[in-house]
């Protein structure tokens, strides 16, 4: 079974409401059109966010909606931006997003990569001057649904403290890969930091201390104080989140750091865009993304390759289990289970997120009650202290 949110466990159990997919879909569609997006654009954005919620990744789901609105009001996201292809070959392209909504330019970029892969065997597209694009895995799955191998990565505001450093210089820099298989597609999506900034935000909302080994304060010392770590990240005062592997080479810190650099190469370096340490500065997002689609047909019979991979995945699931363990998962199984469970039981939304949604509805002139009936969030608190 899948926990309510991956990596958060019991933190949520007493402080969230469950809402139907249809309710949140309608809410997001109205809100994003109120933000100034077209109906088609709003549909892409909400699909990325609610897909994250259905996977159990609440940190990247509809709770991001209010922050996006703040970024639009600050001029960081340009609702009317027209992404521009500034370099292109039969197998590659570079897009300047001109500060567009990350989900919109990313959807376009992966569509380009898919079409190139169908024609030439591979498509690689790098994007600069964008904004937060949601979960990396959404775009990898776009290619997978077309029978291709999909790859997606993005840099972000600097939150990763390199091994032996005390200042954040890389983003969470997630990497995602999806490959067709039966009965479950292979689907891997993970940050190259111990956790994402979104996880810190959720602990902040819950007023819970961070687990040991996640974060560092401005002086480079271990910290469990979520508000302090987040404030330091926003103010660029130092500290941040540890690389995947933790704080020492003995635990593999240099590996998470290295994976983060691979992401940086595919996103900011190939696009000649801003590296993570320059993202979210000067009032602009400047975030960069990388997308790749690979056509298995250029390696042989796609059906045979899919069957070969599916056989190996089943062998992994059938491997001898450790004492006390009932099941071995392959990547992508838990997301399938999460979608089924959450569609049946409703999408969990934190009460403090609902406070933000209520405020947003009031600000935009939307009828909160038409979505949530008589429910009103029990807490009225600016957990971000103005920092969304």
What are these regions (language model features)?
Residues 1-12:
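Single conserved hydrophobic/aromatic residue that forms the stacking wall/gate
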Residues 13-21, 26-45, 50-51, 58-79, ...:
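Acidic, glycine/proline-rich low-complexity segments that act as flexible tails and inter-domain linkers
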Residues 14-19, 24-27, 265, 270-272, ...:
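Catalytic-core signal marking the mid-to-C-terminal active-site face
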Residues 90-182, 190-191:
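A generic, well-ordered mixed alpha/beta core segment in the N-terminal half of proteins
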Residues 160-234:
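Phosphate/diphosphate-binding glycine-rich loops and adjacent basic-rich segments that engage nucleotide
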Residues 209-278:
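Secondary-shell segments that build the walls of catalytic and ion/ligand-binding clefts
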């Amino acid at each position: 079974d899948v926990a309510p949110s991956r990596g958060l466990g019991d933190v949520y159990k007493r402080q969230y409401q469950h809402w139907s997919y249809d309710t949140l879909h309608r809410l997001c569609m109205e809100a994003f059109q109120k933000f100034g997006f077209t109906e088609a654009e709003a549909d892409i954005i909400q699909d990325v966010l609610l897909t994250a919620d259905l996977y159990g990744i609440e940190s990247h789901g509809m709770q991001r909606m209010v922050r996006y609105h703040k970024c639009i009001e600050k001029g960081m996201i340009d609702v009317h931006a027209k992404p521009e292809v500034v370099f292109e070959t039969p197998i590659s392209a570079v897009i300047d997003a001109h500060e567009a909504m990350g989900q919109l330019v990313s959807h376009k970029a992966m569509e380009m990569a898919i079409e190139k892969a169908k024609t030439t065997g591979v498509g690689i597209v790098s994007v600069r001057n964008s904004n937060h694009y949601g979960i990396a895995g959404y775009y990898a799955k776009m290619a997978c649904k077309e029978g291709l191998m999909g790859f997606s990565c993005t840099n972000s505001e600097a939150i990763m403290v390199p091994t032996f450093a005390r200042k954040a210089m890389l983003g969470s820099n997630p990497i995602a890969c999806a490959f067709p298989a039966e009965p479950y597609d292979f689907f891997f999506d993970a940050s190259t930091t111990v956790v994402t900034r979104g996880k810190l935000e959720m602990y902040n909302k819950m007023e819970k201390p961070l687990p040991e080994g996640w974060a560092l304060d401005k002086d480079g010392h271990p910290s469990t104080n979520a508000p302090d770590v987040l404030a330091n990240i926003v103010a660029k005062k130092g500290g941040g989140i540890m690389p995947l592997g933790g704080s020492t080479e003995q635990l593999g810190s240099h590996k998470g750091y290295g994976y983060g650099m691979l992401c940086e190469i595919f996103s900011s370096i190939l696009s000649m865009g801003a590296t993570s340490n320059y993202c979210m500065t000067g009032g602009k997002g400047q975030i960069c993304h990388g997308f790749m689609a690979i056509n298995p047909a250029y390696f042989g019979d796609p059906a045979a390759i899919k069957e070969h991979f599916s056989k190996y995945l089943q062998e992994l699931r059938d491997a001898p289990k450790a004492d006390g363990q009932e099941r071995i998962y392959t990547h992508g199984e838990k997301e399938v289970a999460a979608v089924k469970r959450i569609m049946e039981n409703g999408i969990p939304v934190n009460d403090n997120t609902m406070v933000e949604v209520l405020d947003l509805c009031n600000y935009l002139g939307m009828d909160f009650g038409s979505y949530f009936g008589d429910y009103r969030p029990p807490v009225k608190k600016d957990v971000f202290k103005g920092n969304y």
